[in-house]
Amino acid sequence: MNTAATETVQLAKVTEVLCRTGSRGAVTQVRVEFLGTAQGKERTLLRNVKGPVRKDDILCLLETEREARRLR
């Protein structure tokens, strides 16, 4: 295990489940809000999640800069 290459993990709470996507509906598009930010600076992202997910679930995000494209 390489301890020199540590990755920062951000916790995010699912605020809204938008739709199912993917060729077989295996991916769910959700809106998440980052935890641990200041009250006036809530930051939300649109993410694709593989597997079961519900509103108010907590996700561990390794990459927090990229946002998923909105699907119809």
Swiss-Prot record:
Residue ranges that the Swiss-Prot or TrEMBL entry lists as coiled coil: none
One Gene Ontology term from the biological process aspect of the record: ribosomal small subunit assembly
Name of the gene this protein is made from: rps28
Gene Ontology molecular function terms on file: structural constituent of ribosome
Alphabetical keyword list: Ribonucleoprotein, Ribosomal protein
Protein name in UniProt: Small ribosomal subunit protein eS28
Family annotation (Pfam families): Ribosomal_S28e
Superkingdom of this protein's organism: Eukaryota
Similarity-based family: Belongs to the eukaryotic ribosomal protein eS28 family.
A cellular component annotation (GO) from this entry: cytosolic small ribosomal subunit
